[in-house]
Amino acid sequence: MSTFSLENCLNGSYGVDTPEEVTFIRRRDANPSAFHGEETVPSNTTEVHSESVSYSSDFEGYSCDSDFTGDNQYSSFDGADSLLLSYDIDEYIDLSESELRVLFDEMVQPIHFGMVLSPTFSRNRFLSCLSLAKSVVVAPLYDPERTLRPFPELVKNLYSGVHDIYLSDSEEAAISSVTDTIEGYTFSPRDVVDNYEPPPLCSVCGLIAYQCPHYDINSLRKNCAEMTIAHDYPIEGLCGLIDDATLLKNLGSFLLPIQCEYTKLPEPTLITPPELTRPTDRVTVDLLQAICDSTLPTHVCYDDTYHQTFIENADYSVDIDRVRLKQSDLLAKVIDEGHLKPVLNTGSGQKRIGTTREVLCAIKKRNADVPELCGSVNLKRLSDDVAECFMLSFMNGDKLCSSNFINIVSDFHAYMSKWQSVLSYDDLPDLNAENLQFYEHMVKSDVKPSVTDTLNIDRPLPATITFHRKQLTSQFSPLFTALFQRFQRCLTKRVILPVGKISSLEIKDFSVLNKFCLEIDLSKFDKSQGELHLMIQEGILNRLGCPVHISKWWCDFHRMSYIKDKRAGVSMPISFQRRTGDAFTYFGNTLVTMSMFAWCYDTSQFDKLIFSGDDSLGFSIKAPVGDPSLFTSLFNMEAKVMEPSVPYICSKFLLTDDFGNTFSVPDPLREIQRLGSKKIPLDEDDRSLHAHFMSFVDRLKFLNHMNQTSMTQLSLFYEMKYRKSGDDILLVLGAFNKYTANFNAYKELYYSEKQQCALINSFSISDLIVGRGKSSKASRRKAVESNGKHRDPSTRDHSKVGTDESKETSTEETTQTEPQGAGSQKSK
């Protein structure tokens, strides 16, 4: 009988029976009782592969032929010489020496005498015992009426020379007497089932079915076909067919008679191609809230209604050097008339009130604890080199020489006309008589939306504003406005500042696709600026045409300043750091960012450079090369190169349309957070809400410019930046399109408790008139008759109209306060 293997079974080469095997099968089927003890198959058809292994002195007298295949050892096994096989033990042969020793200790359990084992370990002997024990367990050679020992005990006995493979009667009785102590479970011995079924024989010729020409294997295959795992996972490369007779005869009890078919799955047919499918969900508030729940998981559970109350009432400690508190003449809190409440919960914060503790928290984060990351440098020489590098990298020398005109007077009159409601020419002070080192301080009432999932552990703090009063700002703002306009005119073509009348983020004939982006994120930008940055600004202003004495004067009262928050009674000295509300804030931050960028990177490798305050973005064909570590070691900045970098600046994504032009799109994640704003004042005519709506429409004017190409870009850039699903962006854009259509749709996103109360109180029943109840029935009838007369216009006394109407009004007011049941009884 041919050797069985899974490969031969699957390709159909195993199972070809000889005439001798057919005769043996017929004889065994005719008289099964006489088969026991009879020779199974002629010896010429079964080739037994065995090896005689000789061993060293540690395994003396042992061989596979003499010790384990002799008649004295297995005399109870009929046909043992012809059926004993050498089973494969590849899983043991592949083990290392140490792993085999561990297995040897577990199975053989030798006795340890120090470093000596009894019996000693021999790799060849142990592997032979494993093979022989496996053949004894697997091959059907043992007496079915007796119980074999477990496999580890078989290996131990064979290795020790004790050839006892069966359990004794006492051991079998001990095993059978063991009962399960777990309630609800019962165990009973199970007889070994052969599961042998005789192959089908042809009634015409008497041959086995698959050898008979009358046997229709195709019909049998169709009848026995079942859905298996192969229908879900097609297996290719299987050729040949295994019929039931061959499968059962050779595998016996190891397999069930199941007919297997292997076919390829058909290609799915789609009515609409996947690339043309679009979401068709109707835009609703619930759908928008579901997007917020999945995109901002920590924001939807965030409620800071009482956070500031906790700060005001809890114990408070803060570490700030040289701070002064004045609690005697604090300004009273401004009482407002309430705010509209958003329907969407997007994690927006409540309006912050500038109390003493809130201001101290903001100063601690925004002004105090200045980082010290840079080393010692020559400030004068380094500032001159950085300013000169700035001019060579960004400025067009020819334009700078020809554009030497600065129109300060016209800018001054434009500034005064803009603020004429609060400022006049008579209010302008004498700058020589003013202390320009003194700055006012306040905290912003609104908090910038957070896009990180940290609201469950971190409370956002408001930003601070350090500013001069309007009369002083009006003296410097026209000068810096004129300088900034000249600065924009003299820039090279590849540099863009997205502010003012001559520049924006809409770039013609430029595509952001197929380019490398470089975005530098600068943390703690305002308070990290020191004397080096101040000297760099002074050098650049002098090169742009600012009078030297004015630039020096401006820088002098920025070296050491004093800020004071009158409302909170907090004041402290600061030095060098950026004043966030003066006339030079945006211009100065942009100059500092550009100068640091030019020193750390070669700007000639970029096709486009965009700067705005502390934001920067560069586009290049090749990967940018530079040293961003200089931001920290030289300029005292906490800088991070954004990876993966996307075209994103000023909270906007840059996209390219089908005509090769670039336009900007506000960040959808920030816009959806603004829809849940809690700082819109409550007005009777919705003036504030309408202003908020118009601002929302102005920011989303790009919607008419969007098509499928730009939406695909936006979805991809959104996934790269935030690592969130970009499929929600299409639904968000649909919501933006709905709520920018008209103001009535936008009003669905906000409500007011006062408006709800007024709406409830507007519903009244004018016909329900209730008289005062008395104990006598006559008074009740009289009240009913009087009420009936009042309801009849023909019988009503016009001389008592005013009196009756006042009574009806009083009774209606009492009806609202009485229970409904009592009122209905009295109204009859």
Curated annotation (Swiss-Prot):
Pfam families the record matches: RdRP_2
Enzyme Commission code: 2.7.7.48
Basic and acidic residues: bias regions: 782-810
MF-aspect GO terms: nucleotide binding; RNA binding; RNA-directed RNA polymerase activity
Segments for region (Disordered): 776-828
Recorded catalytic activity of this chain's protein: RNA(n) + a ribonucleoside 5'-triphosphate = RNA(n+1) + diphosphate
Enzyme class: transferase
PROSITE patterns per record: RDRP_SSRNA_POS (PS50507)
GO process annotations (BP): DNA-templated transcription; positive stranded viral RNA replication
Residue stretches making up the RdRp catalytic domain: 515-628
Family annotation (SUPFAM superfamilies): DNA/RNA polymerases
Taxonomy, superkingdom: Viruses
Record keywords: Nucleotide-binding, Nucleotidyltransferase, RNA-directed RNA polymerase, Transferase, Viral RNA replication
Protein role: RNA-dependent RNA polymerase which replicates the viral genome composed of 3 RNA segments, RNA1, RNA2 and RNA3.
Protein family: Belongs to the ssRNA positive-strand viruses RNA-directed RNA polymerase family.
Subunit record text: Interacts with replication protein 1a.
Protein name: RNA-directed RNA polymerase 2a
Native species: Tomato aspermy virus
